[in-house]
Curated annotation (Swiss-Prot):
Acetylxylan esterase involved in the hydrolysis of xylan, a major structural heterogeneous polysaccharide found in plant biomass representing the second most abundant polysaccharide in the biosphere, after cellulose. Degrades acetylated xylans by cleaving acetyl side groups from the hetero-xylan backbone. Pathway: Glycan degradation; xylan degradation. The active site is at residue 147. The gene is axeA. Keywords: Carbohydrate metabolism, Cellulose degradation, Glycoprotein, Hydrolase, Polysaccharide degradation, Secreted, Serine esterase, Signal. It is an enzyme of class 3 (hydrolase). This is Probable acetylxylan esterase A. Glycans are attached at residue 189. The keyword Hydrolase applies. GO terms for cellular component: extracellular region.
Length: 303
Protein backbone atom coordinates (compact mmCIF):
# COMPACT_ATOMS: atom_id res chain seq x y z
CA UNK A 1 0.00 0.00 0.00
CA UNK A 2 1.25 3.53 -0.69
CA UNK A 3 1.70 5.60 2.42
CA UNK A 4 -0.39 8.74 2.82
CA UNK A 5 2.80 10.77 2.48
CA UNK A 6 3.79 9.16 -0.81
CA UNK A 7 0.26 9.52 -2.16
CA UNK A 8 0.34 13.22 -1.26
CA UNK A 9 3.67 13.67 -3.03
CA UNK A 10 2.43 11.87 -6.13
CA UNK A 11 -0.75 13.95 -6.20
CA UNK A 12 1.23 17.16 -5.73
CA UNK A 13 3.57 16.25 -8.60
CA UNK A 14 0.68 15.44 -10.90
CA UNK A 15 -1.17 18.62 -9.94
CA UNK A 16 1.84 20.67 -11.02
CA UNK A 17 1.93 18.99 -14.42
CA UNK A 18 -1.68 18.88 -15.55
CA UNK A 19 -4.10 21.53 -16.73
CA UNK A 20 -6.00 23.57 -14.15
CA UNK A 21 -9.69 22.76 -13.89
CA UNK A 22 -12.00 25.51 -15.04
CA UNK A 23 -14.14 27.00 -12.28
CA UNK A 24 -17.25 26.88 -14.42
CA UNK A 25 -18.26 24.70 -17.32
CA UNK A 26 -17.69 26.57 -20.55
CA UNK A 27 -20.84 27.81 -22.25
CA UNK A 28 -21.46 26.09 -25.55
CA UNK A 29 -24.47 25.70 -27.78
CA UNK A 30 -25.40 22.43 -26.04
CA UNK A 31 -25.20 21.80 -22.31
CA UNK A 32 -23.25 19.47 -20.06
CA UNK A 33 -25.50 17.32 -17.89
CA UNK A 34 -24.78 14.97 -15.02
CA UNK A 35 -26.44 11.54 -15.25
CA UNK A 36 -26.89 9.58 -12.02
CA UNK A 37 -29.22 6.77 -13.10
CA UNK A 38 -27.23 5.11 -15.89
CA UNK A 39 -27.28 1.69 -14.26
CA UNK A 40 -24.91 -0.26 -12.06
CA UNK A 41 -22.09 1.98 -10.84
CA UNK A 42 -20.02 -0.19 -8.49
CA UNK A 43 -17.28 2.37 -7.83
CA UNK A 44 -19.26 5.61 -7.85
CA UNK A 45 -17.79 7.06 -11.05
CA UNK A 46 -19.46 10.31 -12.08
CA UNK A 47 -21.11 10.53 -15.49
CA UNK A 48 -21.40 13.74 -17.46
CA UNK A 49 -22.76 13.89 -20.97
CA UNK A 50 -22.76 16.47 -23.72
CA UNK A 51 -25.52 16.13 -26.32
CA UNK A 52 -25.03 18.64 -29.15
CA UNK A 53 -27.81 20.72 -30.59
CA UNK A 54 -26.70 19.32 -33.94
CA UNK A 55 -27.32 15.71 -32.88
CA UNK A 56 -26.99 13.26 -35.75
CA UNK A 57 -29.49 10.51 -36.44
CA UNK A 58 -28.12 7.33 -34.83
CA UNK A 59 -25.22 9.37 -33.44
CA UNK A 60 -21.78 8.16 -32.55
CA UNK A 61 -20.33 8.38 -29.05
CA UNK A 62 -16.93 9.57 -27.84
CA UNK A 63 -15.91 8.66 -24.29
CA UNK A 64 -13.37 11.30 -23.18
CA UNK A 65 -11.46 10.39 -20.01
CA UNK A 66 -9.64 13.01 -17.95
CA UNK A 67 -6.14 13.14 -16.46
CA UNK A 68 -5.12 12.98 -12.77
CA UNK A 69 -6.37 15.99 -10.75
CA UNK A 70 -9.13 16.28 -13.36
CA UNK A 71 -12.89 15.87 -13.48
CA UNK A 72 -15.43 15.19 -16.19
CA UNK A 73 -16.52 18.85 -16.29
CA UNK A 74 -12.86 19.92 -16.31
CA UNK A 75 -12.08 17.76 -19.34
CA UNK A 76 -15.21 19.13 -21.01
CA UNK A 77 -13.80 22.63 -20.58
CA UNK A 78 -10.19 21.81 -21.45
CA UNK A 79 -10.68 19.62 -24.52
CA UNK A 80 -12.17 20.06 -27.98
CA UNK A 81 -14.66 17.22 -28.03
CA UNK A 82 -17.85 19.14 -27.25
CA UNK A 83 -17.08 21.68 -29.96
CA UNK A 84 -16.30 18.88 -32.41
CA UNK A 85 -19.54 17.14 -31.46
CA UNK A 86 -21.50 20.15 -32.73
CA UNK A 87 -19.71 19.77 -36.06
CA UNK A 88 -20.09 16.01 -36.38
CA UNK A 89 -23.21 15.31 -34.33
CA UNK A 90 -21.84 12.76 -31.85
CA UNK A 91 -22.46 12.53 -28.09
CA UNK A 92 -19.60 12.95 -25.62
CA UNK A 93 -19.45 11.06 -22.32
CA UNK A 94 -17.12 12.55 -19.70
CA UNK A 95 -16.55 10.10 -16.84
CA UNK A 96 -15.36 11.66 -13.57
CA UNK A 97 -13.02 9.84 -11.18
CA UNK A 98 -14.42 9.07 -7.71
CA UNK A 99 -11.02 9.42 -6.02
CA UNK A 100 -9.62 12.45 -4.21
CA UNK A 101 -6.57 12.75 -6.47
CA UNK A 102 -8.66 12.51 -9.61
CA UNK A 103 -6.73 9.56 -11.05
CA UNK A 104 -8.33 6.39 -12.39
CA UNK A 105 -8.16 2.88 -11.01
CA UNK A 106 -6.05 1.05 -13.56
CA UNK A 107 -4.41 -1.17 -10.95
CA UNK A 108 -7.01 -3.38 -9.24
CA UNK A 109 -8.13 -6.78 -10.43
CA UNK A 110 -11.71 -5.49 -10.55
CA UNK A 111 -11.01 -2.72 -13.06
CA UNK A 112 -8.74 -4.98 -15.13
CA UNK A 113 -11.50 -7.57 -15.57
CA UNK A 114 -14.52 -7.53 -17.90
CA UNK A 115 -17.60 -7.02 -15.70
CA UNK A 116 -15.28 -7.07 -12.70
CA UNK A 117 -16.98 -4.27 -10.79
CA UNK A 118 -14.26 -1.61 -11.13
CA UNK A 119 -14.05 1.81 -12.77
CA UNK A 120 -13.99 0.21 -16.21
CA UNK A 121 -17.30 -1.51 -15.47
CA UNK A 122 -18.94 1.79 -14.54
CA UNK A 123 -17.72 3.48 -17.72
CA UNK A 124 -18.92 0.57 -19.86
CA UNK A 125 -22.37 0.93 -18.30
CA UNK A 126 -22.39 4.62 -19.25
CA UNK A 127 -21.84 3.60 -22.86
CA UNK A 128 -24.62 1.01 -22.94
CA UNK A 129 -27.03 3.46 -21.26
CA UNK A 130 -26.24 6.17 -23.82
CA UNK A 131 -26.70 3.80 -26.75
CA UNK A 132 -30.12 2.83 -25.40
CA UNK A 133 -31.23 6.31 -24.35
CA UNK A 134 -30.29 8.12 -27.58
CA UNK A 135 -30.47 5.38 -30.18
CA UNK A 136 -26.75 5.76 -30.76
CA UNK A 137 -24.90 3.65 -33.30
CA UNK A 138 -23.17 0.88 -31.35
CA UNK A 139 -20.63 0.55 -34.16
CA UNK A 140 -19.53 4.17 -33.76
CA UNK A 141 -18.37 4.27 -30.15
CA UNK A 142 -14.87 5.59 -29.46
CA UNK A 143 -12.68 6.18 -26.42
CA UNK A 144 -9.89 8.66 -25.76
CA UNK A 145 -8.03 10.07 -22.79
CA UNK A 146 -5.02 11.93 -21.46
CA UNK A 147 -2.45 10.60 -18.96
CA UNK A 148 -4.43 8.62 -16.36
CA UNK A 149 -7.32 8.84 -18.81
CA UNK A 150 -5.03 7.43 -21.49
CA UNK A 151 -4.21 4.53 -19.19
CA UNK A 152 -7.94 3.96 -18.73
CA UNK A 153 -8.44 4.19 -22.49
CA UNK A 154 -6.09 1.22 -22.91
CA UNK A 155 -7.88 -0.60 -20.10
CA UNK A 156 -11.30 0.04 -21.67
CA UNK A 157 -10.05 -1.24 -25.03
CA UNK A 158 -8.82 -4.42 -23.33
CA UNK A 159 -11.72 -5.07 -20.94
CA UNK A 160 -14.61 -4.03 -23.22
CA UNK A 161 -13.33 -4.46 -26.79
CA UNK A 162 -16.84 -5.21 -28.03
CA UNK A 163 -17.98 -1.68 -27.14
CA UNK A 164 -15.41 0.37 -29.04
CA UNK A 165 -14.45 0.83 -32.68
CA UNK A 166 -11.30 2.89 -32.03
CA UNK A 167 -9.27 4.60 -29.34
CA UNK A 168 -6.71 7.39 -29.06
CA UNK A 169 -4.21 7.37 -26.21
CA UNK A 170 -2.46 10.59 -25.13
CA UNK A 171 0.55 9.79 -22.95
CA UNK A 172 -0.50 6.65 -21.12
CA UNK A 173 0.84 3.18 -20.30
CA UNK A 174 -0.04 -0.32 -21.45
CA UNK A 175 -3.18 -1.99 -20.13
CA UNK A 176 -2.14 -3.86 -17.00
CA UNK A 177 1.18 -2.05 -16.55
CA UNK A 178 -0.05 -0.41 -13.32
CA UNK A 179 -1.38 -3.73 -11.97
CA UNK A 180 -1.15 -3.97 -8.18
CA UNK A 181 -0.28 -7.38 -6.76
CA UNK A 182 -1.86 -6.19 -3.49
CA UNK A 183 -5.04 -5.31 -5.41
CA UNK A 184 -4.70 -1.64 -4.56
CA UNK A 185 -7.39 0.60 -6.01
CA UNK A 186 -6.16 3.78 -7.68
CA UNK A 187 -2.55 2.77 -7.02
CA UNK A 188 0.56 4.47 -8.37
CA UNK A 189 3.17 2.17 -9.91
CA UNK A 190 6.55 3.88 -10.11
CA UNK A 191 8.19 0.92 -11.85
CA UNK A 192 5.75 1.19 -14.73
CA UNK A 193 5.66 4.99 -14.75
CA UNK A 194 9.45 5.16 -15.08
CA UNK A 195 9.41 2.80 -18.06
CA UNK A 196 10.94 -0.18 -16.29
CA UNK A 197 8.20 -2.71 -17.14
CA UNK A 198 9.56 -4.07 -20.42
CA UNK A 199 8.41 -7.26 -22.08
CA UNK A 200 7.49 -8.79 -25.44
CA UNK A 201 4.53 -7.98 -27.68
CA UNK A 202 3.23 -11.50 -27.10
CA UNK A 203 3.34 -11.13 -23.33
CA UNK A 204 1.68 -7.72 -23.42
CA UNK A 205 -1.01 -9.11 -25.70
CA UNK A 206 -1.68 -11.98 -23.30
CA UNK A 207 -2.12 -9.49 -20.46
CA UNK A 208 -4.69 -7.50 -22.45
CA UNK A 209 -6.52 -10.58 -23.69
CA UNK A 210 -6.75 -12.03 -20.17
CA UNK A 211 -8.90 -9.06 -19.15
CA UNK A 212 -11.78 -10.56 -21.15
CA UNK A 213 -11.21 -14.32 -21.13
CA UNK A 214 -12.65 -16.19 -24.08
CA UNK A 215 -13.40 -13.09 -26.15
CA UNK A 216 -12.73 -13.62 -29.85
CA UNK A 217 -14.57 -10.73 -31.50
CA UNK A 218 -13.37 -7.49 -33.05
CA UNK A 219 -11.14 -5.07 -31.17
CA UNK A 220 -10.81 -1.29 -31.43
CA UNK A 221 -8.07 0.10 -33.62
CA UNK A 222 -5.60 2.12 -31.56
CA UNK A 223 -3.63 5.32 -32.06
CA UNK A 224 -0.90 5.95 -29.47
CA UNK A 225 0.64 9.39 -28.75
CA UNK A 226 3.61 10.01 -26.44
CA UNK A 227 6.24 12.68 -25.89
CA UNK A 228 9.99 12.09 -25.98
CA UNK A 229 10.71 14.12 -22.83
CA UNK A 230 7.84 12.85 -20.67
CA UNK A 231 9.15 12.62 -17.09
CA UNK A 232 5.85 11.50 -15.53
CA UNK A 233 5.14 8.46 -17.69
CA UNK A 234 8.52 7.85 -19.29
CA UNK A 235 8.81 7.45 -23.09
CA UNK A 236 9.50 3.71 -22.82
CA UNK A 237 5.79 3.38 -22.10
CA UNK A 238 5.09 4.45 -25.67
CA UNK A 239 7.06 1.52 -27.01
CA UNK A 240 5.49 -0.93 -24.56
CA UNK A 241 1.97 0.24 -25.44
CA UNK A 242 2.67 -0.11 -29.15
CA UNK A 243 4.10 -3.57 -28.48
CA UNK A 244 0.91 -4.54 -26.66
CA UNK A 245 -1.45 -3.62 -29.46
CA UNK A 246 0.89 -4.96 -32.14
CA UNK A 247 0.75 -8.26 -30.29
CA UNK A 248 -3.03 -8.15 -29.97
CA UNK A 249 -3.47 -7.49 -33.70
CA UNK A 250 -0.80 -9.94 -34.78
CA UNK A 251 1.53 -7.35 -36.29
CA UNK A 252 5.29 -7.77 -36.31
CA UNK A 253 6.29 -4.99 -33.93
CA UNK A 254 9.85 -4.99 -35.26
CA UNK A 255 8.72 -4.48 -38.87
CA UNK A 256 6.15 -1.67 -39.18
CA UNK A 257 4.63 -0.97 -42.59
CA UNK A 258 5.89 2.60 -42.68
CA UNK A 259 7.33 5.49 -40.69
CA UNK A 260 6.44 9.07 -41.61
CA UNK A 261 8.54 11.99 -40.34
CA UNK A 262 6.93 15.32 -39.40
CA UNK A 263 3.48 13.73 -39.34
CA UNK A 264 0.96 14.95 -38.24
CA UNK A 265 3.16 17.99 -37.54
CA UNK A 266 6.79 19.05 -37.26
CA UNK A 267 8.83 16.87 -34.88
CA UNK A 268 6.11 14.22 -34.67
CA UNK A 269 6.84 10.82 -36.20
CA UNK A 270 4.03 8.44 -37.12
CA UNK A 271 4.69 4.71 -37.26
CA UNK A 272 2.07 2.54 -38.95
CA UNK A 273 1.92 -1.19 -38.26
CA UNK A 274 -1.34 -1.71 -40.13
CA UNK A 275 -4.92 -0.49 -40.35
CA UNK A 276 -5.46 -1.10 -36.64
CA UNK A 277 -2.39 0.49 -35.06
CA UNK A 278 -0.50 3.76 -35.33
CA UNK A 279 2.08 5.20 -32.95
CA UNK A 280 2.86 8.92 -32.89
CA UNK A 281 6.04 9.96 -31.08
CA UNK A 282 6.44 13.67 -30.37
CA UNK A 283 10.05 14.83 -30.10
CA UNK A 284 10.57 17.57 -27.51
CA UNK A 285 7.09 17.16 -26.02
CA UNK A 286 6.58 16.35 -22.35
CA UNK A 287 3.55 15.26 -20.37
CA UNK A 288 1.01 15.26 -21.88
CA UNK A 289 0.90 15.37 -25.68
CA UNK A 290 -1.79 17.92 -26.60
CA UNK A 291 -5.05 16.57 -27.95
CA UNK A 292 -5.17 16.52 -31.75
CA UNK A 293 -8.92 16.79 -32.15
CA UNK A 294 -9.01 16.94 -35.94
CA UNK A 295 -6.80 13.86 -36.17
CA UNK A 296 -9.03 12.07 -33.67
CA UNK A 297 -11.99 12.80 -35.91
CA UNK A 298 -10.16 11.23 -38.84
CA UNK A 299 -9.16 8.17 -36.80
CA UNK A 300 -12.73 7.75 -35.59
CA UNK A 301 -14.12 8.12 -39.09
CA UNK A 302 -16.15 11.27 -38.51
CA UNK A 303 -13.99 13.38 -40.84
Amino acid sequence: MLSTHLLFLATTLLTSLFHPIAAHVAKRSGSLQQITDFGDNPTGVGMYIYVPNNLASNPGIVVAIHYCTGTGPGYYSNSFYATLSEQYGFIVIYPSSPYSGGCWDVSSQATLTHNGGGNSNSIANMVTWTISEYGADSKKVFVTGSSSGAMMTNVMAATYPELFAAGTVYSGVSAGCFYSDTNQVDGWNSTCAQGDVITTPEHWASIAEAMYPGYSGSRPKMQIYHGSVDTTLYPQNYYETCKQWAGVFGYDYSAPESTEANTPQTNYETTIWGDNLQGIFATGVGHTVPIHGDKDMEWFGFA
